[in-house]
Regions:
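Metal-dependent phosphodiesterase/phospholipase catalytic core, i.e.
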Residues: 2-112, 127-140, 154, 164
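C-terminal active-site rim and adjoining tail of enzyme catalytic domains
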Residues: 34-38, 115-215
Length: 215
């Protein structure tokens, strides 16, 4: 479950921690517009098996339970399709999960408005060489995103989250509806983004295909 309660995402009410798995499995999921669907709430294992061989899965709220998640990844043989992520320094991540970091895809999340952000990236590059970094920034005038593009070019992929303006310097899904070149195009061409997290996948795909950037 994404939330602490089941109210927003299902036809139930109450806190997740107060319910049994059997009770949660009786609930039906809502779609992104809040409309009820025929789908029940899956367990993580069920969701991973459904995704296996089809898509990658971004577990963005799993950091506190990575050890439990890793057991399920091994059971389902899905470690290669799950992105495990967190905002902690590399020393903390290695101390807590070092026994299996080489067996999973771990992506650091770095808020590059912070002064220490370049050091955080440098430490990760030196010690873990992540396949990608999720970079977040609010300050539209910040020079750091361009610096990050130069530092990571050819070494690690850059991921930006376009769900909200505060995560990508104003270059979000809403802005893209008015001017996709100034939003998605800017992140790709100017800041080196190769992965974009969006709530508007169909719109984004149409844009990317119009530019010849997607099959």
């Amino acid at each position: 479950m994404h939330d602490d309660t089941v109210d927003r995402t299902t036809n139930g009410t109450g806190k997740v921690k107060d319910k049994t798995l059997a009770e949660i499995k009786q609930l039906r999921l809502k779609d992104k517009d809040g409309q009820l669907t025929e789908h029940a709430v899956p367990t993580l294992e069920e969701a991973l098996l459904a995704a296996k061989g089809q898509i990658m899965v971004n577990l963005d709220k799993a950091y506190p339970i990575f050890d439990d998640v890793y057991i399920i990844l091994r059971k389902t043989d899905t470690a290669d399709l799950v992105i495990m992520k967190g905002a902690q320094p590399v020393e903390t991540v290695k101390r807590e999960f070092g026994s299996y970091l080489d067996k999973v895809i771990y992506m650091p999340v770095v808020t590059i408005d912070e002064e220490k952000s370049m050091k955080v990236v440098e430490d990760y590059m030196e010690q873990l060489h992540p396949v990608a970094f999720e970079l977040c920034y609010r300050n539209v005038a910040s020079p750091v995103p361009a610096q990050m593009e130069r530092r990571l070019a050819g070494k690690s992929l850059i991921w930006y989250n376009t769900l909200w303006a505060s995560l990508a310097g104003g270059h979000d899904d809403e802005a893209a509806r008015k001017d996709p070149d100034a939003s998605y195009g800017y992140l790709i061409n100017k800041l080196g983004a190769r992965i974009l997290q969006t709530d508007s996948p169909a719109f984004m795909l149409d844009y990317l295909r119009s530019k010849g950037w997607h099959d």
